Structure formats: structure tokens, C-alpha cells
Amino acid sequence: MAAAGDRGGREAACGHDSYRSPLASRYASPEMCFLFSDKYKFRTWRQLWLWLAEAEQTLGLPITDEQIQEMKSNLDNIDFRMAAEEEKQLRHDVMAHVHTFAHCCPKAASIIHLGATSCYVGDNTDLIILRNAFDLLLPKLARVISRLADFAKEQADLPTLGFTHFQPAQLTTVGKRCCLWIQDLCMDLQNLKRVRDELRFRGVKGTTGTQASFLQLFEGDDQKVEQLDKMVTEKAGFKRAFIITGQTYTRKVDIEVLSVLASLGASVHKICTDIRLLANLKEMEEPFEKQQIGSSAMPYKRNPMRSERCCSLARHLMALVMDPLQTASVQWFERTLDDSANRRICLAEAFLTADTVLNTLQNISEGLVVYPKVIERRVQQELPFMATENIIMAMVKAGGNRQDCREKIRVLSQQAAAVVKQEGGDNDLIERIQADAYFSPIHSQLDHLLDPSSFTGRASQQVQRFLEEEVCPLLKPYESVMKVKAELRL
């Protein structure tokens, strides 16, 4: 993100005659876009130069209050056109902005960037942005979990057909299935928080991480160099800085960051794929606006476009983790510049993509529609087959022979299956059992034996316990931001 490069005035290109990433122009929230903007980045560079100067002054370097005040007064006075022209000539973005800052701070010009290297502003700014980007994502993820938790609680007892291999399996409940989604997202919330809290500042380290330039500034005073590093780290709001760096902070950090975002992408993709499949089965739908058009040619269509968008972007988010993996592996010795162009793209895109999928998933989770009658019909189509073992056990209790009963059930089941598969009819296994005198001892028990709630096990209790013991405590730190609604740009 921050290293030598050439914008050459391209930031002025806008409108409809130049490419812009759809992540910024179409999808991501304004607050996340601002965090990765040039304005935020270069303003943070200036803030870092100010913090460095303040700390150096405190530790005895000849820096005046007037110079400090001049820097403070010009933090937002950024001449982007001048910076672009400087970079065009110098082919170095940091020095271009040193000159631009110095131009509006003539008294402080001599002490701007004193003792520092490009990565002092570049890498430290990246770390500040990464931390702040996590701070934007975490409440959004918490809100998604909260909305889905409300949905799971509401649907905790509604029996639905479970699927393994996307083939009918035993019953579960709509709420229990939702808890599978929530559990993955809870793991993501914990992982994002962990990586955010473990971020360390690069600090004040010099060109190859040895702090040689600062040791020279302070005339060999080790303690003052240590104090300088600590003071700037604290000003930036970090608890710790790396003790060891090359010119850059280790690019393993970027792997950690994008790995947890990619893992979030996998969770979102699974959830939204399930919703898309359920929409096809007509059991559940995402919100669909009154004026929304599903197809230009088929007016009856209600396509799950929000879930499809999430899946589309989640694939991109998962793929991005390959960039920092490759980058970290080819950083020769103290650093090479082939990390720079790649990181300008992948770090921003990862957070803008994660931001978009969370905004969209919150919107989906706030308006999920369930169709109980459709669910009930599908359950009734499969339940007779599931109930055969219970029917056999009831017959044995009534005095029947298990083997004889099993054979009769097998024959009747095959006949019923033929009606479903070959004739397209409904499952009539229960009608066949009711018509067979052999099963007369249990005819009065059939309704009880076919009660769907008796096939869902402890699903309802599991939902309640999971929400109370795991989800609610995890969401407690985010209570104050739970009421925020998701706004989709498109």
C-alpha cells in the first residue's frame, strides 16, 4: 500500500471515462471506502510525522514548539495535485509527500521525517488502517450473528427435512439449521477479534530494522531510542510494537489478516448457498422488494440475488489470501519492493469485500421469509419412510414378528416409492399401511408415530442452549451497536 510508485495524477480521473473498482463504486460502505482512501492514508502519514517529531522533541532533539504547531495546523492541508507532480518526477510517493508537507510547513521542513524511512509512514499507516478496518467489520459481523440468532430462536421448533449429500435425511428444525450458520460466524468473530488485538505496530525502526539512524540522532543513547519507539507506538494506540523487523513488518501479518477474512468468506458462501438452495425448494427466501425484478424475460422469477452476490464476492475474498502467502514467501532478506503493488490491491480489496458481504448478509438476515406449509409438505413426503422403524417397533410391542413386519413394510415402501418416482404421485405409504389388516393393532397409533416433532431429537433444546451459553456472551460487547440497519448501495 505505501511504498514507491507512480500515481502521476491518476487520482484526478473519475466519472464514466475511467475504470473504478466496483467494490468502491458499487458495493462497499462509505466508511470502509474512506478508510482506504488517499485522503485517510496521507493524512495518517502526516500524523505519524507529527507523532515522531513530538516524541523526538520530548526526548531532547532540537525541535521547536512552533515547528510542532505548524505541522499540527497542516495535517489536513494536503495538495494532492502537487504531490502527484512531485511523485511523477521523483518516482517515490513518500518523498513526494515529504516535499508536499514541507511546502505548507516551511518552518518544520527540516525536521519532517527525521531519522525515518519510507516504511515508517507506509507500514505503520497500513497497520493503523488494518486495525481500524477490523473495528468496522467486527460490529457488522456481530449484527449478522444477532439477526440470525433472533431468527433461530423464532424457528427453533419448526421441523424441517434435513439433508446429507443434498438427499433427504432425518428431520432437524429450521432454527437448528440456522445455528450451524451462526456457529461458523461466531468462530469468525473470535478469529477477527484475535487477529485485530494481536496486531503490533512496526514502530520506529529505520531502514533495515536496526534503528541505526535513531541511535545516531540520540548519540548512542539506547534508552532514548527505546523510549522513542514506545512513545510513538502509544500515540498510535497500539499496546505493542515489533522488537524485530526488517525494513518492513513481517508480511506474515498480512497472511494472518487475509486468512481470517478468507475464512469469513467461506462461512458466508456456505450460508448463502444454503439459502439459495432453500429458495429453489421454496422453503425460504431472502427479502424481495415490491418493485424488484427477478428476470428481464421471466416476470414470475424471484431470484436470490443478494445471496448470489455474497457467494460471488466471497469467492473473491477467499482467493485473495493467495496474494500475501506468495508475497511473504518472496521477501528477500530485509525486504524487496515486489510486495508494494500487490499489497496496494489485496489488502484494500479484502476489507472492502468483507465489508460488502457483511452488509449484504445483514440485510438478508433481517428479512428472511420462511414458508412453513411448503416445509410441512416436504416433510410429509419423506416422513413415512423415516417412520418405518418406529412402526416396526410398535408392531413388535403389539405382539407382531419383527421379520414378518419388516418384510411387509419393505414391500409397501417399494410400492409407495414407485408411485412417487414413476407416477409423480404423493407418498401413500401410510395409506397402504392403514389399508393392510396386518397393521390393524397399531392403526390408532399412526398419527402419534408420524408426529414430526418426535423426529427432531434435541434440536430445540440445542438451539436454546447454544444461544444462551455461546452466542449471547459473545455478542455482549457489541450491545450498543446492535440497532444499526444495513444499507445496501445496490
From Swiss-Prot:
Entry binding sites for substrate: 26-27, 91-93, 117-118, 247, 309, 335, 340, 344
InterPro entries documented for this protein: AdenyloSucc_lyase_C (IPR019468), Fumarate_lyase_CS (IPR020557), Fumarate_lyase_fam (IPR000362), Fumarate_lyase_N (IPR022761), L-Aspartase-like (IPR008948), Pur_lyase (IPR004769)
Pathway terms, separated by semicolons: Purine metabolism; AMP biosynthesis via de novo pathway; AMP from IMP: step 2/2; Purine metabolism; IMP biosynthesis via de novo pathway; 5-amino-1-(5-phospho-D-ribosyl)imidazole-4-carboxamide from 5-amino-1-(5-phospho-D-ribosyl)imidazole-4-carboxylate: step 2/2
Superkingdom of this protein's organism: Eukaryota
Cross-link Glycyl lysine isopeptide (Lys-Gly) (interchain with G-Cter in SUMO1): residue positions: 421
Keywords: Acetylation, Isopeptide bond, Lyase, Purine biosynthesis, Ubl conjugation
Enzyme Commission no: 4.3.2.2
Broad enzyme group: lyase
Family (UniProt): Belongs to the lyase 1 family. Adenylosuccinate lyase subfamily.
Protein task: Catalyzes two non-sequential steps in de novo AMP synthesis: converts (S)-2-(5-amino-1-(5-phospho-D-ribosyl)imidazole-4-carboxamido)succinate (SAICAR) to fumarate plus 5-amino-1-(5-phospho-D-ribosyl)imidazole-4-carboxamide, and thereby also contributes to de novo IMP synthesis, and converts succinyladenosine monophosphate (SAMP) to AMP and fumarate.
Protein name per the record: Adenylosuccinate lyase
The organism of origin for this protein: Bos taurus (Bovine)
Classification lineage: Eukaryota, Metazoa, Chordata, Craniata, Vertebrata
